[in-house]
């Protein structure tokens, strides 16, 4: 279910402060974040965030198409190795 319109998008407060600090400094560093639940805002476009996936920070470069989505959508938490090979075919 989508978030109610009257509430507006959710963004952790520290995230806005970090992004503004990097923009003011003019540096192009990776901003490490743990808030996968935060919505990507228009002022984040052009910045690179390191989104934590449970074991490491995945670099996510934000572009215009990502605005309105959540950071967690771009940093997968599970690794898929495929289904097990057919053991009968392997023996022959």
From Swiss-Prot:
- This protein's source sits in the domain of life called Bacteria
Keyword rRNA-binding: yes or no?
yes
Q: Name one GO cellular component term.
A: cytoplasm
Protein name per its UniProtKB record = Small ribosomal subunit protein uS19
Please give the Gene3D superfamilies that the UniProt record associates with this protein.
30s Ribosomal Protein S19, Chain A
Q: Which BP terms does GO give this entry?
A: ribosomal small subunit assembly; translation
Species assigned in the record: Rhizobium rhizogenes (strain K84 / ATCC BAA-868)
Per UniProt, the keywords (alphabetical) are: Ribonucleoprotein, Ribosomal protein, RNA-binding, rRNA-binding
User: Which GO molecular function, any one, fits this protein according to its record?
Assistant: rRNA binding
Q: Which family does it belong to?
A: Belongs to the universal ribosomal protein uS19 family.
Q: What is the lineage of its organism?
A: Bacteria, Pseudomonadati, Pseudomonadota, Alphaproteobacteria, Hyphomicrobiales
Instruction: Give the protein's biological function.
Output: Protein S19 forms a complex with S13 that binds strongly to the 16S ribosomal RNA.
- Keyword Ribonucleoprotein annotated: yes
């Amino acid at each position: 279910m989508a978030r109610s319109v009257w509430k507006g998008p959710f963004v952790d407060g520290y995230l806005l402060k970090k992004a503004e600090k990097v923009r003011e400094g003019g540096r192009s560093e990776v901003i490490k974040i743990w808030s996968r639940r935060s919505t990507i805002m228009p002022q984040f476009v052009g910045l690179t965030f390191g989104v934590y996936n449970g074991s490491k920070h995945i670099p996510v470069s934000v572009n215009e198409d990502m605005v309105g989505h959540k950071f967690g959508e771009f940093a997968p938490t599970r690794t898929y190795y495929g289904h097990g090979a057919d053991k009968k075919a392997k023996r022959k």
